[in-house]
Each structure stands twice: as C-alpha cells, then as structure tokens.
Amino acid sequence: MRSRDDIQPVLAADVLAYGERWPVYVWTVEHPQGLVLVDTGMVEPHPALAEWEPRCYPLAEELVARVAVVINTHLHFDHCGGNRLFPGLPIHVQARELADARADDEYTIREWVDFVGARYVEHEGEVEILPGIRLLPAPGHTAGHQVVVVDAEEGPAVLGGDVAYSFAELGRGETEGQRRVLELGALTWLAHESRPKVPERRS
C-alpha cells in the first residue's frame, strides 16, 4: 500500500483564464513498478493557444527518464502537452476521451496526442492499472474525463485533473464526476489548485 507522501505535485505551466493566471499541476506517484506520471502539462507554447498566454515549465529530464507509466485525466492541451516525451510508454486514458480528442479539431492540439511512438492504453470504465492505483471515470469537464485514485495507507487520495477548477466548484457536485469524487471523501488534488484538501459538499 502506498503512502500519500509518494504523491508529489509538479507545476507544469500556468495559463491566463478568466483574467487570472492559473497554475497547471501534474503529479508523480512513486510505485514499486515504476514512477507513475498523471498528466503531462505543456512542453512549449502553440500558436493556437495564444489567448491563453501559456508559460511552460517543462518536466525535468531526470524525472522524464524515470517515468514508467503515464495517465491522462483527459486530453485537453494543458494536460497532454508533454505526452510526446514518452514514446513507447503506456499512456492510460478512457476510450471515450481518446475518441473525442481525435474526432474534433477544436478539442486539443492533435499533434500533442497522436505522435510517433504514441502507445495509448484505452479503458472503458473503472480499472486498477497497478496495485493500489485505480482509474475512475469522472465525466463532466469532458465526457471521457477520469480521476486517479491512489489507495494509500492513510486513506484514498484522488488526483482529480479538471473534475473541477476549484474546490468551491467541486463542492457543488453539479456533474457526475464531481459527485463521484465527493462520495469518496478523500484527500483530493485539482490541477488548478496549489494544495489538496478533502472536499465538502455545499448546497
């Protein structure tokens, strides 16, 4: 069983959204079978993203070299921009998410998803991909969004991606994915929040 100390947030970028700079976090999880990376941030800006004014903080080379497994919560540009750093490695994603990303040119930056050596492992529903690491569908932000549940000795921890932009939004439980996370009552990280917390449902 993992410890929550095995989970480390990594600031991968920040973007301009709603007039403010929003951080974009990814996470590493130390695991006996190798380092797991949840989301990959952004490696470089792209002309299509000019309005977001992204500032990218590429993953350290030594971290990239250690990664054994990649998980995408979803395939929007700020969560999959570093996927191409991992040709040949398994990248776990919900099948619906990958299909949607490939079907709509406005969904993401296509070449950041489909690159030479891309090896996607598609899932349909909840699955344990490594002992103590589960993928849980959490639709809402996108139809194929998923969260990562780490079964830690202190209790489960959730790496939530964009299941919500903020804990205030998460607490309202307006989407199916948000309600699933709230039901877990677990310590939760969000991609645009700097610290984790146990979310509380709000009326």
Per-range role (PLM):
Residues 14-15, 34, 42-45, 77-78, ...:
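Short, solvent-exposed loop/turn segments at secondary-structure junctions
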Residues 81-87, 199-202:
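Metal-dependent catalytic neighborhoods of phosphoester/phosphodiester hydrolases
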Residues 34-36, 69, 155-159:
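Structural motif
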Residues 21-23, 121-123, 142-144:
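Residues that act as N-cap/strand-start positions at coil-to-secondary-structure junctions
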Residues 1-55, 182-184, 200-203:
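Zn-dependent metallo-beta-lactamase
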Residues 42-49, 57-78, 85, 90-137, 143-203:
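Metallo-beta-lactamase
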